[in-house]
């Protein structure tokens, strides 16, 4: 829950048993018109709902079922997503295709005039960095192609995009693909675009095209009836402060204070408060 907790606990292994059926109401699917009311999908942060903000969920049909690809809150005035949210479960963790050869393209759900184009990246010295990585969505060709929408792109320095950020993405994919039929890893990713001291600069000095100074992830892992949570915060730089992912870990509460975003607000309040106040690096295999 997005408010300051009176106490913070670091390095404590917390697995919270949830005996209520809180997820039953939380997994309903919403459509792209839900920008004006709270959604119940577990992975989604609280919507900012600013005048220039648009909430979009992309779907695919997989094995005859409608499946959520990923969701985003997109700021049209900054031509950048505030966050991207998705999940790994027994279905979406599958690796049935390789990276798409499809070109980067405009997102059909948002007017192209509100999106960046190729010239905003390479010629400016930045990669077209996926927020929802291509390797995050490999269960079908259609979903992988959706990750190449420009609304899912963020200007990233190549050494960051192919370095420590890629390392974190790979670790998250490993956790996600460890899911069994009763497990789900909920993921939120983003770059900072709202606070001036968290903006690295602007493409061509255009204030509608900020470059994030920091990138983050918020993770919630449901394993059976137990939960754990952790977050990561990385400065967008060519030279990382560390090559160890553990050095970037923090609690969800701490990430909320940095970003001003309320993560996982659809959880039961007591569960949310307990999960977000602390984290244990030992609870996440491969982190230490």
Go through each PLM region and give its residues.
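Bacterial N-terminal signal peptides
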Residues: 15-22
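Domain-level detector for secreted/extracellular nuclease and nuclease-toxin modules, and
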Residues: 2, 26-288
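Bacterial N-terminal signal peptides that target proteins for export
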Residues: 2-15
């Amino acid at each position: 829950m997005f408010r300051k907790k009176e106490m913070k606990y670091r390095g404590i292994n917390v697995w919270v048993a949830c005996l209520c059926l809180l997820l039953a109401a939380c997994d309903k699917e919403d459509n792209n018109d839900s920008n004006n009311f709270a959604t119940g999908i577990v992975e989604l942060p609280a919507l900012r709902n600013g005048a220039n903000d648009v909430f979009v969920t992309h779907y695919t049909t997989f094995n005859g079922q409608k499946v959520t690809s990923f969701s985003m809150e997109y700021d049209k005035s900054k031509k950048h997503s505030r966050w991207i949210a998705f999940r790994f479960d027994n279905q979406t963790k599958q690796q049935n295709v390789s990276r798409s050869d499809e070109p980067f393209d405009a997102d059909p759900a948002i007017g192209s005039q509100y999106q960046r184009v190729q010239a905003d990246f390479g010629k400016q010295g930045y990669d077209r960095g996926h927020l929802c990585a291509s390797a995050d969505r490999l269960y079908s060709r259609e979903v992988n192609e959706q990750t190449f929408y420009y609304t899912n792109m963020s200007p990233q320095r190549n050494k960051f995009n192919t370095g420590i950020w890629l390392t974190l993405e790979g670790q998250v994919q490993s956790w996600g693909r460890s899911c069994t039929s009763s497990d789900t890893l909920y993921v939120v990713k983003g770059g900072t675009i709202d606070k001036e001291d968290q903006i690295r600069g602007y493409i061509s000095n255009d204030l509608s095209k900020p470059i994030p100074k920091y990138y983050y992830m918020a993770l919630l892992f449901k394993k059976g009836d137990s939960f754990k949570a952790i977050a990561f915060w990385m400065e967008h730089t060519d030279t990382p402060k560390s090559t160890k992912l553990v050095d970037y870990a923090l609690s969800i509460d701490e990430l909320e204070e940095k970003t001003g975003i309320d993560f996982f607000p659809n959880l039961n309040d007591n569960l949310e408060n307990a999960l977000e106040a602390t984290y244990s690096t030992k609870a996440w295999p491969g982190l230490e």
